[in-house]
């Protein structure tokens, strides 16, 4: 029975929830490596069923982790605001605990307006604003209203009656601190709702059009007050008084003359035939260059009738067949190895004898 190599065993389903995303991806790569080894899977008794199951579970776990991370990224700003609110509420609770654990002398003094309990609440609010790091005008107004209500409450109670025991003195700061915590939490909720309502979604084209309009207005205002730059003045002067362009130097071109141009303009006024223009162009080419076309060896193309074209084709075909016959005879003679030599039936001796005899005759004639 074959066993999986070390490190490639499929993980139990309960272990996948405790694994991180990096570990899950590493395990998925290992399972893919095992699935690619077809020979190894064929040797297994279950034909790799467990490996396929673990592969599917790993894929599902990775998809779930990615979905959770994506949702957490979407709700990240909301969670930050919630954490800040929880931190503020915790600071208020700490302030209440300190107020409860304080001495009865401080509790009785809290009944007088502007006492230490109210100061403690103010200090907790200031520390809370510093921890948030972004105080706003609305938050300051709400906190001032809360302080006003807290200060007003004990003053009215002092005018009506004074508590006879320390129980009443403990009851009032608790009530004030709890109302303070509720007011601060409601103020944070209102701030959060206001900020969400201020968020608007606008099209990119509208934003660009607004930016362009603002830039145009700014440029119009600035152009009315500022003077034109120097380079704009130079460009306007150059447009009014343009500089004549110089002709580029070209090879094999006669130098430009004003008289020639004027005479050419005068001549161009009169109509010129196509043959005259062609002759002038040819003469101009002969003047500026020494390269000329060679004379034609054959006559230019002509339009022929059908009968003449048929006769020319037949003649061309006959010439072609004759040429093919000559080539075939030459090749056949080369294959048969036929050699043409001079035929002499008397042989070389007869020729020599005749030559010698002729010489003797010449000698005899010379003797006489």
Swiss-Prot record:
Tissue specificity note: Detected in adult an fetal brain. Detected in heart, kidney, skeletal muscle, small intestine, lung, prostate and testis.
Extent of Acidic residues compositional bias: 358-368
InterPro entries in the record: GRINL1, Tuftelin_GRINL1A/MYZAP/CCD68
Pfam family of the protein (one): GCOM2
Comp. bias (Polar residues): 116-131, 205-224, 258-273
This protein's record includes keyword Methyltransferase: no
Stated name of the protein: DNA-directed RNA polymerase II subunit GRINL1A
Species the sequence originates in: Homo sapiens
């Amino acid at each position: 029975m074959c066993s999986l190599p070390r490190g490639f065993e499929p993980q139990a389903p309960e272990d996948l929830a405790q694994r991180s995303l990096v570990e899950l991806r590493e395990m998925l790569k290992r399972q893919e490596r095992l699935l690619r080894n077809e020979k190894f899977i064929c040797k297994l008794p279950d034909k790799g069923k467990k490996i396929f199951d673990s592969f599917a579970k790993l894929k599902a776990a990775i998809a779930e982790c990615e979905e959770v991370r994506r949702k957490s990224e979407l709700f990240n700003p909301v969670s930050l605001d919630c954490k800040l609110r929880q931190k503020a509420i915790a600071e208020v609770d700490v302030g209440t605990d300190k107020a409860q654990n304080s001495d009865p002398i401080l509790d009785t003094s809290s009944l007088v307006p502007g006492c230490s309990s109210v100061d403690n609440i103010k200090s907790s609010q200031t520390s809370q604003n510093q921890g948030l790091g972004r105080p706003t005008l609305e938050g300051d107004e709400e906190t001032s209203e809360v302080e006003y209500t807290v200060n007003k409450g004990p003053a009215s109670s002092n005018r009506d009656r004074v508590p006879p025991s320390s129980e009443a003195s403990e009851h009032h700061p608790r009530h004030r601190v709890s109302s303070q915590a509720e007011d601060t939490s409601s103020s944070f909720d209102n701030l959060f709702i206001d900020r969400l309502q201020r968020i608007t979604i606008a099209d990119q084209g509208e934003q660009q059009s607004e930016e362009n309009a603002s830039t145009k207005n700014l440029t119009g205002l600035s152009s009315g007050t500022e003077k034109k730059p120097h380079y704009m003045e130079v460009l306007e002067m150059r447009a009014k008084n343009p500089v004549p362009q110089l002709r580029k130097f070209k090879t094999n071109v006669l130098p430009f003359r004003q008289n020639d141009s004027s005479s050419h303009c005068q001549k161009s006024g009169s109509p010129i035939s196509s043959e005259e223009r062609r002759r002038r162009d040819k003469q101009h080419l002969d003047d500026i260059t020494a390269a000329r076309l060679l004379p034609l060896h054959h006559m230019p193309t002509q339009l022929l009738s059908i009968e003449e074209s048929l006769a020319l084709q037949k003649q061309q075909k006959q010439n072609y067949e004759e040429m093919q016959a000559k080539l075939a005879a030459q090749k056949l003679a080369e294959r048969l190895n036929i050699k043409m030599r001079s035929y002499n039936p008397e042989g070389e001796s007869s020729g020599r004898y005749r030559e010698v005899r002729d010489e003797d005759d010449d000698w005899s004639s010379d003797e006489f």
